[in-house]
């Protein structure tokens, strides 16, 4: 058996916290990686509707738009308690931001976070 530790990197986008409002994650630069997977990790959901999505841009600070379904390997659904979801990104933009859109005016919401797993580094140490 072989370890993937040296072959993969994890870039945190959304810190795991209790969510009662929409959150847009930190920008993730994909310049040095040929493979990227967005991972949403929900904990206990008490109320509200929490929908994950992936946005992309050519610029680090602006111009983010929703990733087209054709540029995702897989699909995302409304988050449920303790059910992680992931999609591969096969688009051509350099930057990603993960988003959890919250509706329904939750009182306590959802404990959730998200990250991007990156592999196939273009720069091997």
Per-region residue spans from a language model:
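Noncatalytic modules at the cell exterior or secretory-pathway interfaces
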Residues: 34-39, 89-107
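Long, hydrophobic N-terminal alpha-helical segment
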Residues: 2-41
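C-terminal interaction-tip segments
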Residues: 1-12, 102-125
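Surface-exposed ligand/attachment interfaces on beta-rich extracellular proteins
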Residues: 17-31, 44-69, 76-83, 106-107
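Generic structural motif
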Residues: 52, 98, 112-114
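Coiled-coil-like amphipathic alpha-helices with heptad-repeat character
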Residues: 14, 89-92, 117
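Short secondary-structure boundary segments
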Residues: 1-12, 45-47, 51-52, 95
């Amino acid at each position: 058996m072989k370890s993937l530790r040296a072959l993969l990197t994890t870039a945190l986008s959304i810190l795991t916290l209790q969510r009662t409002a929409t959150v847009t994650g930190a920008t993730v630069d994909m310049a040095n990686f040929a493979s990227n997977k967005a991972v949403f990790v929900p904990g206990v959901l008490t109320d509200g509707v929490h929908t994950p999505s992936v946005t992309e841009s050519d610029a680090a600070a602006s111009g983010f738009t929703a990733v087209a379904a054709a540029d995702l390997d897989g699909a995302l659904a409304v988050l449920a308690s303790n059910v992680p979801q992931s999609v591969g990104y096969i688009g051509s933009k350099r930057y990603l931001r993960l988003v959890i859109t919250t509706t329904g005016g939750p009182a306590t919401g959802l404990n959730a976070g998200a990250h991007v797993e990156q592999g196939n580094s273009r720069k091997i140490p």
